[in-house]
Structures are given as C-alpha cells and as structure tokens.
A protein has these predicted regions:
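Non-transmembrane, aqueous-exposed alpha-helical and coiled segments at domain scale
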Residues: 1-302
C-alpha cells in the first residue's frame, strides 16, 4: 500500500488537473511494482524530449522514418497508455521541478552534417519548442550538470541518463535512481517518484573496494579506470575508489563516470576524499565489510 500525503491525495483526486492525476497514478503503479510504500518529492528532472529512433516506435523496422516523435506529451495514448486523455490537458511540468532535456537523436543545429533529413530536423525543433513552452530548459545534453542542472546534497532527482545519475549521486550527494523515459516523464509532471533504491540511506554505502595503483594524471587515465572498475562490478554494487590518485577535476570525473556507466549498471560510486558521502574510507563503507577488493594497476589498464 502506498501512503500518500494530503497534497498527493488531492492530486490523485484530480484537484490539480487531469495530467497530474494520470501521471501520479502511473507513479503509484510503478511504486507498487518496486515494493515502495511512499513517494519522494522530485525537484530536478532530466528527461528525453527530442525525436527518437527507438525500435519500438518503428513497427515496420524502418529506423530512418522521420515522422515519429518520442516525447510522451505528443503521444499520451500509446506511450503512457492513457486512452481518452486529451493531450491538451498537459500544458506544463510540475511547478517546483526544474526540468532539462537530455540529448536526442537529431542534431539541434547541424542536421546536414549528420546526414539527417530536414523534415526530421524540423520535427525535432518543433518538439523542443513545445517542451520549452511547457517549462523545459533546453540543454540537449547528457551532462546537464555542465549546464546549470545541479541537485544539491540530499535533493531527490530523476534522470534518463546513466552517467548523470552517477555524477549526481556520487559527486553532488543528491539522491536518485536511473529511470526510463515514461517514468521520468511522469515524475516531472507530478513532482513525485517512488522512494526506493538510492533514495534510501541504507543503500548508499560501499560494497566493493578498488585500490588505485595506476596513473591518474589525465582524462584518458580516468576513462580507462572507469572501464576497469565497471567490468569488475557485481549487479547493484557500490564501488569505493581509494588509494594514491590525483584529485580529479570535473572533466576527468565526467570521463570516469561515462566509462563506468557503459560497462556496468552502477549508479553510485564513492570516491574517498572527493564524494561528500566518502570523506574517509570508513565513512564510505558505513561500517560494512567489502564484498570484494581489487587493485587497479597500469598493467590492467593496458
């Protein structure tokens, strides 16, 4: 059973409009599947807004068709399975949620250089314009933290980007789980998400320890380190990075988390002395013993 606040119950009853009502019901359904018993307020959302090339959108198998648009507000009935709901019912995202768009399949400006059609480009520009009209900050980036999207420590967020969930959890100390397009979209409308996973303090401690004994001078070193860590992680693991490494800057962290994200399902990585929840090794582990320990050397990176 999901325990709702009085405000959430009013939203579910339709007091704040059909769009929020439907979006919240979808989030409640999602919470029940996850086993969550309550919701958290979402004040930062990062979601897909542009044209898409998802195979599920192309039943005829033709991925070059330019006339399919991705965003849920263009297709409530099929994307969100809400028959009978007028798309016009959705005219804005949640008032207290700062929303920025993710990268998408069509270049925002140089469509000719990427061998895409003008029609596809114009469709993409139209959908981004519609998103902006509904309150989305157009960044078109998979690294929104470089463009002002910065949840603070303890703040709940949703994102469709695997490297962003890592950066926001690990470096900013915010709390979020990687999400799909539809659930993230619904959270951005109703401002709620199921309380589960990395929202919970008991899931935010290290499980696997990585001792760094390799070069960490430049961006490539951190890229390789991220891949090496990711390939050794168990599902749902939280790696702790410790050892004699050079303190990474933002660009090196971006490379590290991108490589870690594509080689694993990791969503939180605690870097001792860098992550706010890992000021010390003991703080990172939270009183737990590691399930496994690894030493990453230059030989491994080669």
């Amino acid at each position: 059973m999901i325990h709702l606040t009085p405000y959430e119950q009013r939203m579910l009853d339709g007091e704040f409009g059909a769009a929020k009502q439907v979006a919240l019901q979808k989030i409640i359904d999602y919470a029940q599947i996850l086993g969550a018993t309550e919701l958290v307020p979402i004040t930062k959302a990062h979601l897909c807004c542009g044209s898409t090339c998802e195979p599920s959108d192309f039943p005829d198998g033709n991925l070059d068709r330019p006339d399919i648009l991705a965003m849920g507000y263009h297709d409530w009935q099929t994307k969100l399975k809400c028959p009978g709901l007028d798309p016009a019912a959705f005219n804005s995202f949640n008032e207290t949620t700062y929303v920025m768009d993710d990268v998408h399949c069509c270049d925002t400006f140089q469509w000719q250089w990427t061998q895409q059609t003008k029609e596809f480009y114009e469709n993409n520009r139209q959908i981004l314009s519609d998103a902006a009209d509904r309150g989305v900050m157009i960044g078109s980036t998979c690294a929104p933290y470089l463009a002002g999207w910065l949840p603070v420590m303890g703040e709940y967020f949703v994102t469709t980007e695997s490297s962003n969930v890592l950066y926001s959890n690990s470096i900013l100390g915010a709390r979020g789980n990687g999400g799909g397009g539809n659930t993230t979209f619904c959270s951005a409308i109703c401002g709620r998400a199921p309380k589960w996973g990395l929202h919970l303090p008991e899931n935010r401690h290290g499980t696997h320890v990585f001792h760094v004994a390799c070069d960490t001078k430049d961006k490539t070193d951190w890229d390789l380190l991220g891949a090496a860590v990711g390939r050794r992680l168990a599902p749902n693991a939280v790696p702790v990075i410790c050892g004699d490494f050079e303190r990474p800057d933002l660009i090196k962290l971006k490379s590290f988390f991108t490589a870690l994200a594509v080689t694993s399902g990791c969503e939180l990585c605690l870097i001792v002395g860098v992550s706010p929840e890992a000021q010390t090794y003991e703080m990172a582990m939270g009183g737990h013993e590691p399930a496994a320990e690894f030493t990453i050397t230059n030989e491994i990176l080669q």
